[in-house]
Amino acid sequence: MATLSSVYFLIYFVSFLAIAAVASFFIIPLLGISFLFASAVVVFGFLSDITFKFAQSLYIKTDHRLKSTLSKMGNQKKGTNNSQAGNSPPPTPQPSVEPQLGPNANVWDAPGAETSTTSAIARSLEAREDVRVTN
């Protein structure tokens, strides 16, 4: 003969199992969806890092090529001016612009205003520890 406490135990145990089964119908699919979203975050983070590094290297190569081309153009222009220096009249002096400027015209204290061989974007990338900028 079963005592009253055994009957209560069976009622509580069966109700616990029923509630656990119903909860698992919700929890297990939600855990699966959460796992899929977490995996997507990791995959997209990896792809983002790869595309950033590719774009950064493409930018640095293009920036270097552009600076090299502009430097060659500048050297060519200087060479052309030097070869024609004896034949051409002296250049006329250009009017100065500074007297026409206002009182705050010479205020320009931007950080990184020193001359550099890299562009402003490449200089900002030099500050990152995980990025290596090469010329």
From Swiss-Prot:
Residues 23-24 are extracellular. The chain crosses the membrane at residues 2-22, 25-45. It holds the Pfam family Osw5. InterPro entries: Osw5 (IPR031430). It comes from the Eukaryota. One of its GO terms (cellular component) is membrane. GO terms for biological process: sporulation resulting in formation of a cellular spore. It is a multi-pass membrane protein. This is Outer spore wall protein 5.
